[in-house]
Design a protein with these regions (language model features):
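Hydrophobic alpha-helical segments, chiefly the membrane-spanning helices
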Residues: 193-199
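Flexible low-complexity scaffold tracts in large eukaryotic assembly proteins
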Residues: 156-159
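Secondary-structure boundary/capping motif
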Residues: 29, 49, 133, 161-165
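Conserved small/polar residues in nucleotide/adenosyl-binding loops
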Residues: 182-189
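Aromatic/hydrophobic pocket-lining residues that form π-stacking "cages" and hydrophobic walls in ligand
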Residues: 3, 7, 112, 173
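N-terminal small-domain helix-loop-helix segment of the aminotransferase-like
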Residues: 1-83, 90
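Glycine/Thr-rich phosphate-binding loops of Rossmann-like dinucleotide-binding domains
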Residues: 28, 88, 112, 161-162, ...
């Protein structure tokens, strides 16, 4: 957050700054979103909602995935959170056991490693510099994986850099991960084996 505060100071002084802190867009909230918020307030939608999302919101998510991606889900498979950080924290708490590793490309949002540590895991930081447009390569991903790898963070568009992986780049990363098979007869007896990437 110190980076964000410093960027704001420099902007106030007239400097042209690209902030790599909070990851906020450089445009205002679109009017139709502002109006929807006003309508919701006028309709009295100002109380606590179900933790996992309202039925109407869950249905909108179901409809979106069906329409845009050809995927079918039920409301019991949808969990709405207040943002990406909460979702990542929830994932870590639910999936990480002691010393499980989480691969995190850097630059990353400041709290990602701490959320892994709070869950008892070990962050594995993969440096992705400006020379590679702040994107992790398949070779870097392969080198970061171990028998203890439980999660891989892939944030696109990236917060804080804004870098976006192309479809080809995502496929290449997916090929590295596709050869991994996790079996879990019990939560404490996990094994990982390699399978051909065509599997």
């Amino acid at each position: 957050m110190a980076v964000t505060a410093r960027a704001q100071e420099l902007r106030a002084a007239g400097e042209d700054v690209i902030g790599l802190g909070a990851g906020e867009p450089d445009f205002d909230t679109p009017d139709h979103i502002k109006e929807a918020a006003h309508v919701a307030i006028r309709q009295g939608q100002t109380k606590y909602t179900p933790v996992g999302g309202t039925p109407a919101l869950k249905q909108a998510v179901i409809d979106k995935f069906n329409r845009d991606n050809g995927l079918e889900y039920t409301a019991s498979q949808i969990l709405v959170s207040v943002g990406g950080k909460q979702s990542f924290y929830n994932l870590c708490q639910a999936l990480i056991d002691n010393d499980d590793e989480v691969v995190i490309p850097a630059p990353y949002w400041v709290s990602f490693p701490d959320m892994v540590l709070l869950a008892g895991g070990a962050p594995v930081i993969v440096r992705a510099g400006i020379d590679q447009n702040f994107k992790m390569t398949p070779q870097q991903l392969e080198g970061a994986l171990s028998k203890r790898t439980k999660l891989v963070v892939l944030n696109s568009p990236s917060n804080p850099t804004g870098s976006v992986y192309s479809a080809a780049e995502l496929r290449a990363l997916g090929e590295v991960l596709a050869c991994l098979l996790y079996t879990s007869p019990s939560p404490r007896d996990r094994t990982r084996s390699r399978m051909p990437s065509s599997a």
